């Protein structure tokens, strides 16, 4: 049975049961995507892993959760009964992510929190329930895979060159490694 067939069969299930099933799936996929309030694991895990591993994780793994939410919302739960809740969760994810990023002094933690914020933008597009919102979410997810992976790879270069990922000790990077500083700036 594929997702489209499951979606057709879902119409036979009472609305309350459908909402409960979608809620449980959203919690599971929300953990993977790191949406608020299920994002606490991400900022602590990415800074501790090697930069190459973090680049792959940041670029791909959180987007698996976003992809699962997109597939579930568009193929199985097409009525959009939880779109308003999803929108509020997305807004909270954006806010928590960016406020967390502002408070960081480590570049990997800063990028981890901004990643959470960006996931909020993707989920917001899904929550709109329109073709434009969905297209924007998909485009942004693909774009974010490339950009976030590149950023964490450059952070790996910065750590290798400077010996630290602390923002307080990277002020002279433009003088000691101008090419790496420019790569990160771009």
What are these model-derived regions, one by one?
Residues 1-186:
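Hydrophobic transmembrane alpha-helices and their helix-loop junctions in integral membrane proteins
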């Amino acid at each position: 049975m594929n997702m489209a067939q499951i979606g057709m069969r879902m119409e036979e299930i009472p609305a309350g049961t459908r909402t409960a099933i979608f809620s449980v799936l959203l919690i599971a996929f929300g953990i993977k995507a790191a949406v608020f309030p299920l994002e606490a694991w991400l900022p602590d895990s990415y800074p501790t892993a090697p930069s190459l591993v973090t680049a792959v994780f940041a670029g791909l793994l959180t987007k698996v959760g976003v992809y699962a939410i997109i597939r579930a919302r568009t193929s199985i739960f097409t009525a959009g009964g939880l779109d308003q809740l999803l929108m509020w969760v997305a807004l909270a994810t954006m806010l928590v992510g960016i406020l967390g990023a502002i408070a960081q002094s480590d570049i990997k933690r800063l990028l981890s929190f901004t990643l959470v914020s960006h996931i909020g933008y993707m989920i917001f597009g899904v929550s709109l329930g329109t073709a434009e919102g969905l297209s924007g979410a998909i485009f942004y997810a693909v774009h974010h895979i490339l950009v976030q992976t590149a950023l964490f790879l450059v952070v790996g270069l910065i750590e290798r060159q400077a010996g630290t990922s602390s923002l307080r000790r990277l002020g002279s990077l433009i003088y000691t490694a101008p090419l790496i500083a420019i790569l990160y700036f771009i």
